A protein has these predicted regions:
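Conserved AdoMet/S-adenosylmethionine-binding subsite of the radical SAM
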Residues: 94-229
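Auxiliary Fe-S-binding modules of radical SAM enzymes
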Residues: 1-19, 30, 52, 70, ...
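An N-terminal domain-start capping segment
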Residues: 29-36, 48-50, 94, 167-170
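Residue-level signal for beta-strand positions within conserved beta-sheet cores that form or flank
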Residues: 22, 36, 115-117, 249
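Conserved Radical SAM active-site core
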Residues: 42-139
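N-terminal pre-triad scaffold of radical SAM enzymes
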Residues: 9-46, 84-86
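Generic detector of contiguous secondary-structure segments
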Residues: 4-8, 27, 87-90, 166-171
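Sterically constrained small-residue positions within well-ordered secondary structures
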Residues: 15-17, 34, 112, 136, ...
Length: 257
């Protein structure tokens, strides 16, 4: 199956997001190859070319600080309509060495030119090992962190993380934060994260993390693995209801209507 092409610029969109309305994406990763700390089986950008937490060799390929600031400022001053400025893109945005500084600048530009626009982050949670990233999270209106699995083995099978990434550490960092959202991709097939035991373990972690809400959804775009399949809207709603009952957390299902 053909996957989606990588984003070729610093900014992309605005795209119509099921969760964010009109979202103007900010891509902090390379344009010509996929650099990420995960190699998820369901990623619509395809397989990860460089799966690592260490960006030392790749810094020269990252968007430069001044270029990102300039692009965001130009968009903020334009007539473009958008509801969110969203750190996302071709890989994990929090791995950019100046991520925290860029959060400060994007918030400053937003406050000056687009005070009604919110700033969002879509993250796979691995960058939380860095203190500067953790300190920047309260400045973001909607920080959304990935948790796809309830157990370490399934985490490795679904997200296929860089060798430096450990499931227990990701959980500990998520539990140390407050006022965040979680996002979870649910899939069936090989691998699957919707089995009874897997969901039970997952809901226990959600209860401990205590996010403001959880967004669950399935695949609706091309993926690199033909052995996985989507979860129906009816099943997503059923899982969301089960999760709300077991955790007391607001869990919302998103899907194409």
């Amino acid at each position: 199956m053909t996957v989606l092409p990588l984003q070729r610029g610093i900014l992309y969109g605005p795209i119509d997001s099921r969760r964010l309305g009109k979202s103007l994406g900010i891509n902090l990763m390379p344009r010509n190859y996929k650099l990420c700390s995960f190699n998820c089986v369901y990623c619509h950008y395809g397989l990860t070319d460089k799966c690592t937490m260490d960006l030392g060799k790749y810094v020269k390929d990252l968007p430069q600080f001044d270029d990102v600031v300039r692009a965001v400022e130009q968009a903020a001053k334009s007539s473009m309509v958008f509801d969110y400025l969203t750190f996302s893109g071709n890989g994990e945005p929090t791995l950019h060495p100046r991520f925290a500084d860029l959060v400060d600048e994007v918030v400053r530009i937003r406050d000056l030119h687009r005070p009604r626009v919110k700033v969002a982050l879509l993250s796979n949670s691995t960058g939380l090992v860095y203190r500067s990233v953790r300190d920047s999270i309260p400045k973001i209106d909607l920080p959304v962190f990935k948790l796809d699995s309830g157990r370490g083995g399934k985490f490795k099978a679904m997200n296929r993380p860089a060798r430096e990434v450990h499931f227990r550490e990701v959980l500990d960092r998520l539990m140390s934060l407050g006022n965040i959202c979680l996002q979870t991709v649910l899939i069936d097939g090989t691998p699957s994260n919707v089995g009874k035991e897997e969901l039970s373990a997952y809901f226990k972690h959600v209860s401990r993390i205590k996010p403001r809400e959880v967004h669950i959804y399935s695949i609706d775009r091309p993926v690199p693995n033909s052995k996985i399949s989507l979860i129906s809207p009816k099943e997503l709603e059923k899982i969301a209801l089960q999760g709300r009952r077991e955790t007391g957390v607001e869990i919302r299902a998103f899907y194409v209507r």
